[in-house]
């Protein structure tokens, strides 16, 4: 399940039990991406706060646009865990006539994306693969696609969150599977 010791739900007490209750799934299970933080409940809380701020708080970017960034970054980083979770979440957010976009983007196919969406995924790609190569012209390209500076900030925040989450998952060995709740659902808090 992980490369380091984790504390399972039934052995959690105090701060950790409260964090598991707060951030766990409706069935009482806790996703492995969170359980890898179990030795440091403050780290789990910080991860969740960053996730909620980046992905669920009000933003001029839609939730689907932010999930597209997450799917793109996770695919580029080779993080199957986050790729599967967030492609499922994206699929739930898209209207019926665009549901296929989630699986296409998961495979790296951006043909179903709008110009605006492609500008977001292009920015996320460059920020993931070559962060020091991002220049004013990249920002100008996003502006020409109709994005304003707040949207660009939120795109950078979403891409940066996934860079962090992917490294936690990959670096600590969180795996999809046993103990996982339903994927792609929103947090309770």
Residue ranges of each PLM-predicted region?
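Hydrophobic alpha-helical segments
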Residues: 1-189
């Amino acid at each position: 399940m992980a490369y380091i010791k984790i504390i399972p739900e039934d052995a959690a007490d105090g701060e950790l039990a409260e964090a598991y209750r707060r951030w766990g799934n409706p069935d009482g299970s806790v996703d492995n991406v969170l359980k890898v933080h179990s030795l440091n409940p403050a780290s789990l809380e910080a991860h969740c706060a960053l996730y909620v701020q980046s992905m669920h708080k009000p933003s001029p970017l839609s939730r689907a646009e932010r999930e597209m960034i997450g799917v793109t970054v996770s695919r580029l980083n080779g993080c199957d865990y986050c790729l599967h979770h967030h492609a499922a979440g994206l699929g739930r957010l898209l209207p019926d006539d665009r549901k296929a976009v989630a699986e296409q983007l998961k495979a790296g196919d951006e043909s179903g994306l709008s110009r605006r969406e492609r500008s977001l995924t292009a920015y996320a790609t460059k920020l993931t693969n070559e962060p020091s190569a991002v220049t004013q012209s990249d920002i100008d390209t996003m502006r020409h696609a109709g994005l304003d500076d707040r949207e660009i900030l939120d795109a950078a925040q979403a891409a940066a969150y996934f860079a962090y989450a992917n490294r936690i998952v990959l670096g600590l060995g969180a795996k999809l599977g046993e103990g996982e709740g339903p994927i792609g659902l929103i947090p309770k808090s």
